[in-house]
Amino acid sequence: MAQFAAAGKAISKKNLAEIAMSYGYVYVAQVSMGANMNQFLKALTEAEAYHGPSLIIGYAPCEMHGIKKGGMQNCQLEMAKAVKAGYWNMFRYNPTLENNKLTIDSGDPSADYQEFIANEARYARLAQSFPDRAKDLFEKAEESAKERYERLKKMGKLYE
């Protein structure tokens, strides 16, 4: 098993959705089926109807995430927790709409980010191996998630 970032990744991950939206002609949605099935289905329907390229990015835990409480039988619940903690934002961007091109479907984070990542063994392994580094990286990841959400809200206002 390859563990490319077993010691933690110090830089922020790329934001594929923002990159695609910057083109201005790509339908983009970020979904989490376990958090909101209706939003997931709406995104699929809109993407299929869109005359142009569409990109749907879904949050889907896998066995390697190592969900501590209940394992993969709780993956739908884990998807909902990711959204509530602000780890994953749900939205739809439709460039053909005149108003409200960007719809944010997930609300403000309402759950503890650190508690969410503590429930996944992939993060717990880092905390066991490099506790100080893990604490620092987890705090940076939470801050990055907050910044992503704030940037998304600002983009939403631009597209009103």
Show which residues each predicted segment covers.
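Flexible, low-complexity linker and terminal segments
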Residues: 60-160
